[in-house]
Amino acid sequence: MGEISITKLLVIAALVVLLFGTKKLRTLGGDLGAAIKGFKKAMNDDDTGAKTPAASEAPAERLSHKE
């Protein structure tokens, strides 16, 4: 009852293609791929940008505890 079989998935895929058309789905897939690619690039740029200033900063002074 709760299982999703291959035939059910094929029927759903056929309905989606009939409703939206192949051109709309192709455009949607391309937009989604570009969004994911842009997100990954932004994450990598953010990581490299965060590491660069820290490496160029002078080391902090060492504090010693005096009793």
Curated annotation (Swiss-Prot):
Chain spans, region Disordered: 44-67
Which residue ranges run through the membrane? 4-21
**Bilayer topology term:** Single-pass membrane protein
Major subcellular site:
membrane
Q: Which GO terms describe its molecular function?
A: protein transmembrane transporter activity
Is Magnesium given among the entry's keywords?
no
What are the entry keywords?
A: Cell inner membrane, Cell membrane, Membrane, Protein transport, Translocation, Transmembrane, Transmembrane helix, Transport
Q: Which PANTHER family match?
A: SEC-INDEPENDENT PROTEIN TRANSLOCASE PROTEIN TATA, SEC-INDEPENDENT PROTEIN TRANSLOCASE PROTEIN TATE
Q: What does this protein do?
A: Part of the twin-arginine translocation (Tat) system that transports large folded proteins containing a characteristic twin-arginine motif in their signal peptide across membranes. TatE shares overlapping functions with TatA.
**Family the entry assigns:** Belongs to the TatA/E family. TatE subfamily.
Q: In its UniProt entry, what is this protein called? A: Probable Sec-independent protein translocase protein TatE
**Species whose genome carries this gene:** Cronobacter sakazakii (strain ATCC BAA-894)
